[in-house]
Design a protein with these regions (language model features):
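Gram-negative and organellar
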Residues: 2-362
Length: 362
C-alpha cells in the first residue's frame, strides 16, 4: 500500500494529508473509499521501500448521535396536506446508535496503482422512536492510480438498508474522482457520480406506492484547494445535482457551493465546513399543495475533529501501542427553508465515533 509514494516525494507528509482531506470531504466518496484512502496514507508513512503486496484489515466501530429534530418537524410545527394546514406530528430530540464492522482486502498492483474490495454491515437503533432503526449492508470496489500529478480514483458501490418500519431500498452507483497538483500549494479536484435507488414494494406497503420515490441521481463538482504553512488547507467547490424520479414531484435539480478550512493539530485534524444548496422540484405534489411549487434552500454547517485516540489522550498509548483506535467528533447543523411548510426545518446533530482497526494481513 504505497499508492501515493510519488506524491510524498514531491511534498511533505502534512501537505499530502491536506490534499487527501479534500477527497475525504467529498460527499460523493463512499465511507469505504474514505477508509481505504486513510489506510494508504498510514502505510506510506510506515514503508520506506515499499513492495507490491496484498493487504487486509478489519474495522469495528461504534457511533452515538444526539439529534435535536430527528423527524424533521417543521419550524412552524405545521404542514400542508391537500392545500390545508395541519399539525406536524413527530419526535424531536432523540439519540441513535450505530454498531458495525467492515473488512477491506486489496492489493498494490504497481508502484502507482492499487485496488481494494470492501464489505460492511452496521446495525442502527434509536432510543425513543423506531423510524430510524435499520441494518445496512454495503460494499464497494475502488481502484487508485497516479499519472503524473493526477491522483485518479474510480469506484463502484452498493448498499441495502433494511428498514424496520419503512420500505427497504437498494442503491448502486459508480463514481470518479481526480485531484491534480498544480504546484506545491495549489490543486484542483473534480468528480462525478451516478446512483440508482429502488424501493421494495411488498405486500405490506403496496398501498403507499413507495416505488414512486425510485430515483437516479447524477452529480458533478469541481473544486480548488490552497494549502499553506504545511498544516492548513482552504478548499472550495461548486457542484450540480440532478435527481430523476418515477414521479416528478420527487425529482429536482440544483447547484451547491461549499467552502471549508482544514488544519492539522497535534491532537487531530480539525475541519470547518459550510455548504449552500438550492433544489428546485420539477412538479407540484398535489397531495401536499396544488398551487405551490417546491423549492428548498439548505445551509449545512459542520465542525469535525478526528484522529487517533492516542493524539487526544496520550496515556492510552499503553493500551493502543500501534495507534489503531480512531475517534471522530462531528457537529452538524442543517437549516432548511422551503416554499412548503413541512420542508422548512432546523436540525442539529452531534455525534461521536470510535473505530478499532485490526490488521489481518500486511
Amino acid at each position: 500500500l504505497y499508492l501515493i509514494s510519488i506524491l510524498l516525494k514531491m511534498d511533505s507528509a502534512a501537505k499530502l494529508q491536506l490534499m487527501i482531506e479534500t477527497m475525504l470531504q467529498d460527499p460523493n466518496t463512499t465511507k469505504e473509499t474514505r477508509d481505504y484512502i486513510q489506510e494508504i496514507l498510514k502505510t506510506i508513512r510506515d514503508q520506506s521501500q515499499p513492495k507490491p503486496k496484498w493487504f487486509a484489515y478489519l474495522d469495528v466501530n461504534y457511533m452515538q448521535t444526539d439529534n435535536s429534530n430527528i423527524d424533521g418537524v417543521s419550524k412552524t410545527g405545521t404542514l400542508y396536506a391537500r392545500d390545508n394546514v395541519s399539525e406536524f406530528p413527530g419526535l424531536k430530540y432523540d439519540k441513535t446508535y450505530s454498531r458495525g464492522a467492515s473488512i477491506t482486502v486489496g492489493k498494490n498492483l504497481s508502484s502507482s496503482s492499487a485496488i481494494s474490495f470492501n464489505g460492511a454491515l452496521s446495525v442502527n437503533t434509536q432510543n425513543k422512536g423506531e423510524e430510524n432503526e435499520s441494518d445496512l449492508a454495503s460494499g464497494s470496489v475502488s481502484y487508485s492510480k497516479i499519472v503524473g500529478k493526477h491522483f485518479l480514483l474510480p469506484y463502484i458501490f452498493y448498499s441495502r438498508p433494511n428498514q424496520r418500519l419503512s420500505a427497504d431500498l437498494k442503491t448502486k452507483g459508480v463514481g470518479f474522482n481526480n485531484t491534480y497538483n498544480i504546484n506545491q500549494n495549489n490543486s484542483v479536484s473534480y468528480s462525478s457520480s451516478y446512483s440508482k435507488s429502488s424501493y421494495n414494494r411488498s405486500a405490506a406497503n403496496a398501498a403507499s406506492n413507495v416505488d414512486d420515490a425510485n430515483n437516479e441521481i447524477y452529480s458533478a463538482n469541481i473544486g480548488y484547494n490552497y494549502s499553506f504553512s504545511d498544516v492548513n488547507l482552504i478548499s472550495s467547490k461548486i457542484s450540480y445535482t440532478e435527481k430523476k424520479a418515477k414521479k416528478n414531484y420527487n425529482a429536482y435539480t440544483g447547484p451547491s457551493f461549499n467552502i471549508g478550512y482544514t488544519r492539522i493539530l497535534p491532537f487531530g485534524t480539525l475541519k470547518l465546513d459550510k455548504t449552500f444548496e438550492t433544489n428546485t422540484y420539477e412538479e407540484k405534489d398535489t397531495f401536499v399543495h396544488s398551487t405551490i411549487s417546491r423549492e428548498d434552500d439548505i445551509e449545512t454547517s459542520q465542525i469535525q475533529l478526528s484522529g487517533r485516540i492516542t493524539q487526544l489522550i496520550p496515556f492510552i498509548k499503553k493500551f493502543d501501542l500501534e495507534g489503531k483506535i480512531f475517534y471522530n467528533f462531528k457537529y452538524t447543523e442543517i437549516d432548511s427553508d422551503s416554499s412548503l411548510l413541512q420542508n422548512s426545518s432546523m436540525r442539529k446533530n452531534t455525534s461521536f465515533n470510535l473505530i478499532k482497526r485490526f490488521s489481518l494481513y500486511e
